[in-house]
């Protein structure tokens, strides 16, 4: 009876616990404690189909639990019960997709790695197989990041838990960080397996520890850019509840903007930035702008409504420059065509249209910029392309209301990894937070208090330096993966 209970515990509860640990670790200081343990559990059950699904399901369920905060949607015309069903369905739907993806990865593990032989397998062959499986996960996250179905995974979730290891992103990007983390998880699992079978594991432990030290040293090896105060930028964290924003009149926004511009000028700012969606559609200033401004808002184009960052010169009453949001939130901002007859989406403004996929923004009042509007912070590839094209600073504008602090922390993690990857300062500005400045090393220089209206100045550095990752992107990762596939085929064919 007890033995049966233990089997059920190992079969069902342990993989669930592993996924929960991973979800808790994502974008928190608990990473050091929970993520290695979570990945150890993943590897230990990786040949079990159900275990893989459960790990992935609970990882997403916990890490993306903020999706429940969509409820209540009564302000959009949904009934209370409909709102609850929609929110829970979205969360569980995403969790099921996560479970399926890890399940598919597990099939690859079963095909490539015979777990019963790992304690006796040649070290080189074992390393090749584990690296190949880890690369498969990392490349999978990269591919997903090019779709609107991805928010955060293992790669960016390492921050703030281990900033030294995250420093490797300058060379290998977020996808490479996935590879490193999964390899660490397997190393712990291999030590456990050797200990359980009473094999010598001292060399495995010491060699792995040495590699860990080297990786942390390389990740922490950087040449900080000397900070300056040459271009002070004012950030207006508006703290306007999204569920009430439809009631705000243009005159109210104008009055707020006049006040924000006066504060910015009193602090000697050269530029004022406001969060995503600050200005209503067809908004015009009823005064001449006193300062250069990048304001989140909406604009009508011939193809429909766009969410944009709108550029104002001194003296402008309407925007003279813009960059449109390209990546739209599924259901929230863009719904499939066949659903248009049922809903305008889970958004106050209804469906909007995507702009150009380029995140490079050049105007004559600053050095070239890389712009990420909300969800676009997940797409490291396009931000990297903007930096490669000459952007000297990243600006990340968002509206994360009404979501909880958990989402704020994940947005911060994403923004910090983008800074590390490209060695660029990152100005973040959000409605209810987070807002502030992140250094090129991924360190937080200034962070406003959340859920309060604030107007303060940050002093970003513009930099023309480019990292290895900025220059080459994921190409080395794909080439190494192909090389590992070749080696795995070679050893499979010519060795026992």
From Swiss-Prot:
It is found in: Cell inner membrane. Pathway: Protein modification; lipoprotein biosynthesis (N-acyl transfer). The keyword ATP-binding does not apply. Its main location: membrane. The active site is at 276 (proton acceptor), 325, 374 (nucleophile). Its EC number is 2.3.1.269. One of its GO terms (biological process) is lipoprotein biosynthetic process. Keywords: Acyltransferase, Cell inner membrane, Cell membrane, Membrane, Transferase, Transmembrane, Transmembrane helix. The chain crosses the membrane at residues 23-43, 50-70, 84-104, 126-146, 171-191, 205-225, 476-496. GO terms for cellular component: plasma membrane. It is an enzyme of class 2 (transferase). Residues 236-464 form the CN hydrolase domain. GO terms for molecular function: N-acyltransferase activity. It is a multi-pass membrane protein. The keyword Acetylation does not apply. Catalyzes the phospholipid dependent N-acylation of the N-terminal cysteine of apolipoprotein, the last step in lipoprotein maturation. Belongs to the CN hydrolase family. Apolipoprotein N-acyltransferase subfamily. This is Apolipoprotein N-acyltransferase. It comes from Prochlorococcus marinus subsp. pastoris (strain CCMP1986 / NIES-2087 / MED4).
């Amino acid at each position: 009876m007890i033995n049966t209970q233990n089997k059920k515990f190992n079969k069902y509860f342990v993989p669930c616990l592993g996924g929960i640990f991973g979800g808790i670790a994502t974008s928190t200081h608990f990473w050091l404690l929970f993520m290695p343990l979570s990945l150890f559990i993943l590897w230990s059950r990786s040949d079990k189909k159900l275990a893989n699904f459960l790990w992935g399901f609970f990882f997403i369920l916990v890490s993306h639990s903020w999706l429940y905060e969509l409820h209540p949607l009564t302000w959009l015309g949904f009934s209370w019960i409909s709102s609850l069903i929609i929110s829970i369905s979205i969360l569980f739907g995403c969790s099921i997709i996560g479970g399926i993806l890890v399940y598919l990865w597990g099939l690859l593990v079963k095909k490539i790695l015979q777990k019963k032989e790992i304690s006796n397998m040649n070290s080189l062959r074992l390393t090749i197989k584990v690296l190949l499986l880890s690369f498969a996960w990392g490349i999978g996250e990269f591919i997903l990041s090019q779709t609107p179905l991805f928010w955060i995974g293992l790669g960016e979730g390492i921050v703030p838990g281990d900033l030294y290891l995250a420093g490797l992103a300058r060379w290998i990007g977020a996808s490479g960080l996935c590879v490193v983390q999964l390899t660490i998880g397997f190393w712990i699992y291999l030590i456990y397996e050797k200990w359980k079978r009473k094999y010598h594991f001292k060399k495995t432990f010491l060699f792995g520890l040495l590699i860990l030290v080297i990786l942390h040293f390389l990740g922490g090896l950087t040449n900080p850019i000397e900070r300056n105060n040459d271009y002070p930028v004012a950030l207006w964290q508006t703290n306007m509840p999204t569920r009430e924003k439809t009631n705000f009149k243009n005159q109210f926004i104008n009055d707020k903007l006049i006040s924000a511009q006066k504060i910015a000028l009193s602090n000697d700012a050269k530029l004022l930035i406001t969060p995503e969606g600050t200005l209503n559609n067809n908004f015009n200033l009823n005064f001449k702008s006193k300062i250069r401004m990048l304001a989140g808002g909406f604009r009508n184009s011939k193809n429909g409504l766009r969410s944009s960052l709108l550029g104002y010169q001194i003296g402008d009453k309407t925007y003279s420059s813009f960059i449109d949001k390209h990546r739209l939130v599924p259901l929230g901002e863009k719904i499939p065509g066949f659903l248009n007859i049922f809903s305008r989406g889970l958004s106050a403004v209804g469906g909007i249209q995507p702009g150009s996929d380029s995140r490079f923004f050049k105007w004559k009042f600053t050095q070239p910029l890389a712009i990420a509007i909300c969800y676009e912070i997940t797409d490291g590839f396009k931000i990297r392309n903007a930096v490669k094209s000459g952007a000297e600073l990243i600006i990340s504008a968002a509206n994360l209301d009404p979501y909880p602090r958990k989402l704020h922390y994940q947005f911060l993690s994403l923004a910090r990894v983008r800074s590390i990857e490209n060695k660029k300062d990152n100005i973040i500005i959000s409605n209810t937070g987070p807002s502030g400045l992140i250094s090129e090393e991924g360190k937080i220089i200034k962070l406003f208090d959340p859920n309060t209206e604030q107007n303060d100045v940050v002093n970003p550095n513009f930099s023309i330096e480019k990292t290895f990752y900025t220059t080459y992107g994921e190409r080395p990762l794909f080439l190494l993966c192909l090389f590992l596939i070749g080696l795995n085929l070679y050893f499979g064919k010519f060795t026992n």
